[in-house]
Amino acid sequence: MNREQWLNECIQRLRPDFEQLARPLPEKIRASCSWPSKSGLAAKKRRIGEAWSSRNSADQSHEVFISPVLKEPIEVAATLVHELVHCAVGVEEGHKGKFPRLAKALGLVGKMTATTASAELKAHLQQVTDSIGPYPHAELTHSNATKKQGCRLLKVVCECGCVVRMTRKWLDEVGPPTCGCGSPMVEEEGDGDDE
C-alpha cells in the first residue's frame, strides 16, 4: 500500500461518520500526499492540508492534499478529516457557516483554520488507522534557516560617532580609513553586531 492508497482507504472508513451527521461525502474524492498550493513551507501559518473543489477538476473529483511534513497517522487522519469537512460542506464555505458546525460535530477542536483532533476523535482515528496499517510515509523536512552571511562586515568607528563597515580583508590590507572629520577610525572590539 502506498501513501495515496492509505489516504483513500482512510476516506472510505471515515464516510460513515459523515453519513451519521447527514453530511455525506461526495462520491468522487482523491487524496494524495503533496505540497499545498501555497504556504506549504512557510515558517508561520504553514498549510498542512488543502481541499480543492470538484469544479477545478476535469473529472469533477474533489482533490485533497496532505502535506509531506506530516508523518504521524493520527495527525494525518485528523488533517484529512478537516479537509473532508471542506468537501462535505463545499470548499466555498471556507471556515465559516456550515464548516465549524460539522467540524465540531466530528470532533475537531481549536481555531477552525488550524483544527486538531479532540481526545474522542483521536481515539476513533486510532482505531481507523490501526485497521488500515502504518502510514507508508517518511516525513519530508525543509529547513527555513537563513543562509549564512557570506561576507562578515566589521564595525569601524570614529570618536565623532561616524560608523562604517568593512571586511577583514580590507582592514588587514589597507587598514581603517580616515574619517571625513579628519580623525583616524578604529575597528571596534567585539562582534560588531550591536548596531
Protein language model regions, located:
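Metalloprotease/metallohydrolase-associated module, dominated by Zn2+-dependent proteases
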Residues: 1-72, 91-195
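Active-site recognition of the HExxH zinc-binding catalytic motif
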Residues: 78-91
